[in-house]
Every structure is written in structure tokens, then in C-alpha cells.
Amino acid sequence: MKLQTTYPSNNYPIYVERGAIDHISTYIDQFDQSFILIDEYVNQYFANKFDDILSYENVHKVIIPAGEKTKTFHQYQETLEYILSHHVTRNTAIIAVGGGATGDFAGFVAATLLRGVHFIQVPTTILAHDSSVGGKVGINSKQGKNLIGAFYRPTAVIYDLDFLKTLPFEQILSGYAEVYKHALLNGESTTQEIEQHFKDREILQSLNGMDKYIAKGIETKLDIVVADEKEQGVRKFLNLGHTFGHAVEYYHKIPHGHAVMVGIIYQFIVANALFDSKHEINHYIQYLIQLGYPLDMITDLDFETLYEYMLSDKKNDKQGVQMVLIRQFGDIVVQHVDQLTLQHACEQLKTYFK
């Protein structure tokens, strides 16, 4: 499947298929030099997939740490210095091969190297079906996640679904959170459909039917980011579950998707409190338990600490914390939420696990 962005200009293709990696070679000849930034995990299992590409004299491989460990100032500077030592021109390509963190990091390198060079995304995880599309790139700060970054469109996104075969279950769980988020944004019927399809751990682990929902998720995100690239309006909806989720992820050092799922439950509790919504919290908790999400850490949540991280969320303004909330399916809002409501929601969340 080939999708295409529909901006007024500077559009890029998104290949979503098995064997999609073959498309990389069609781009290599266009650049003076190319640097494949590949995470250590992918390099361990799939290094041979890039043998043909690396046979080009002007293609270099840079192995970087997997996951959020790579999104640091130290790694950023080290990578830039290595690339600059090759006397690069602006007709250079940075090719990100790995999960969402790899794409974030490599994209920020591409956006800032010589004030912008070509950038190709080659996502290798379910989670990255979300982050590879839309042009958000960046690294982390001690103050929080993704606070240093840019909007920078890739030249192409090449999503080879064969990479998913070796994902450990923890990565499947983490990635599914973003797939499920897109279903929630699409509405109640789509949410019910995906819950009925992936109804337990065994089915989710098999990845049976995942291709369809990944493609649907990408289409959902494309519709939103083309309408609002710089996150001034509806693109904020894509942060569903992320205000509280990012705080939980950053403080408790758990996988991104696991934290987002906690954030999704949390926003349902907040929506019930603010709008008298009728979301069945037990339903969502039981669904996550059936899928195998480890939720024991919820009893250890410390609101005061998490609130400090929430205050650093990029959606906030001078009025305080903003959250994306599902008032009811089909009615999504970005709402300021006061500290007391947030605290009560955190306390209520914890009561479900006592």
C-alpha cells in the first residue's frame, strides 16, 4: 500500500507493505551521502537486510542505542560530529531505522544538520506507525520528554511490516496503545471492532490482522496532521492519553505505550468528573488486563511528582494543564483541568487497584 500526504506542497509517500525496504535503494542515488542511523536492537536482528544498501560507497551506518536512551544531548552531539566529519553537503540523507525514539532522534539530527537535510523514516515497530508520520522530531530534556524538537517532514516513510515478526511482546503492547488510541479517535464502533478483534493476549501476540489496523491508524493520523500540521487545533487530539501518560512514562521509566494506556484510562476518569460522562472505567481496565498490560505500578503513582511533569506538557498555556478528553465518542475536546480535579482523578484511578 502506498499512501501520500496531501499538503499544498512538499508532500511525501508512505509505503506500508511487506518488503517495503526495497524502496530505499530508489532514493540512495539521489543523495551525495546517506547515513543509516539504526538502533542496536534492529541491527542485531536485521543487519543483513541492509547489506546491499551499505555496499554503496556513499552510504554509512551509525549504530545508536535503542529506545529513549538515544534521545539525549550527548548522543545528539556525538552523532552530529561523526556525520560532519564526512564533509557532508545539504544533499545528504539521514535514514532512521528503528522504533519511534530512533525516528524522533534521527529526524532532529536531519532537521538541524546544515539547517536541514533529507530524512527518510524506516520504522520497525508498531509504535512507530504513529510517530513516523506527521513530522514531529526531537530529543528529551531533564525537564521532560520531547521538549526539544521541531516539525520536520520526511522525504519518505518506508514501513516494512516484516520487521514486526521479531518484536518482543512488551513492544507489541507498547505499540498497540497508539493503534488503540487511533481507534478511540475514530469513534465507538471502531473501538468496539478492535476490542473484539484483539480480545486477549494470545490474539494480540499473534499480530493476526494487525496490518489492517496499522494502515487504518496511519490514515487517521494523516487526515489530522494534514489539516493541522503545527498542532494549533485538531492535531492536539493525537495527544489523547499523553498528558498523564508522558508523566508516568518519564517518572516510572516504563514503555511509552504502557504509559499511554494508563493515560487513556485517566482521561476517562477526568472526563467523567468534568462532564458527567458515563465512561465505564472498569471495562477499560479489564480490557488492558486481558491483553496483558502490567498495571501494578498504578498503586505507586505519586500525584505531586507526576503533576510537576504534567506542568511541562507542550499543550499547556498560561492557564495551566490542558488535556485531550473524550467527552463522549465523537466529541473530543482540549480542556484546561485544575489541579484538584487532576489529583482526585489520580486517587480514583488508584482505588481500582487496591
Curated annotation (Swiss-Prot):
It comes from the Bacteria. NAD(+) binds at G100, A101, T102, G103, D104, T124, T125, K136, K145, F163, L164, K165, T166. Its EC number is 4.2.3.4. Binds 1 divalent metal cation per subunit. Can use either Co(2+) or Zn(2+). It catalyses: 7-phospho-2-dehydro-3-deoxy-D-arabino-heptonate = 3-dehydroquinate + phosphate. Its cofactor is NAD(+); Co(2+); Zn(2+). GO terms for cellular component: cytoplasm. Its main location: cytoplasm. Catalyzes the conversion of 3-deoxy-D-arabino-heptulosonate 7-phosphate (DAHP) to dehydroquinate (DHQ). Belongs to the sugar phosphate cyclases superfamily. Dehydroquinate synthase family. PANTHER family: 3-DEHYDROQUINATE SYNTHASE, 3-DEHYDROQUINATE SYNTHASE, CHLOROPLASTIC. This is 3-dehydroquinate synthase.
